[in-house]
A protein has these predicted regions:
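All-alpha prenyltransferase/terpene-synthase fold signal
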Residues: 1-158
Length: 158
């Protein structure tokens, strides 16, 4: 059965990173005795924050904003990790460039020339820009949720 790779990645992230955030927000909502609507909003807020965090973390791994970035640049590529940027490239790159990226990922190489090549493939096809836009969509969703939370009922009792 064929699945959309982006939907698959979203489901993986839903079960991993966003789960951590979602659960902490659910605990907060429970402590505040949030009504059902507020509880659902807090859960969704945690999920959106978790998804945004995961995607931006993957992006910073291949395109850090400072030299002092604590992770080794492109370590996800060296580990053969399939990220949102990789899936976007596989959907839009020509066969040769997609095959080149897959080859580098499968090699689990630490060769800096190969890693720069992989990052270059992601840049030239706009995957990093599109991933950043997806982060923006998650953050916009967070803002919408937050703006509605003030209208919800909490029955906090110390």
């Amino acid at each position: 059965m064929a699945h959309d790779p982006l939907e698959y990645l979203q489901s993986v992230l839903h079960r991993s990173t966003s789960y951590t955030y979602r659960m902490s927000f659910k605990i907060d909502a429970s402590i505040a005795n949030a009504d059902e609507r507020a509880f659902a909003a807090y859960s969704r807020l945690g999920e959106e924050i978790g998804l945004a965090f995961h995607v931006i973390d993957d992006q910073l791994n291949v395109a850090p904003v400072t030299e002092e970035w604590s992770k080794t640049t492109a370590e996800d590529i060296a580990a053969g990790k399939v990220t949102l940027q990789v899936l976007l490239i596989l959907q839009r790159a020509d066969r040769n460039r997609a095959a080149e990226l897959v080859r580098i990922l499968r090699a689990s190489t630490t060769d800096q020339r190969e890693l720069r090549n992989a990052v270059g493939i992601m840049r030239e096809r706009g995957a990093l820009i599109e991933a950043r836009a997806i982060v923006g969509q998650h953050l916009d969703a967070c803002l919408r949720i937050i703006s509605n939370i003030s209208n919800m009922n909490f029955r906090y009792r110390p």
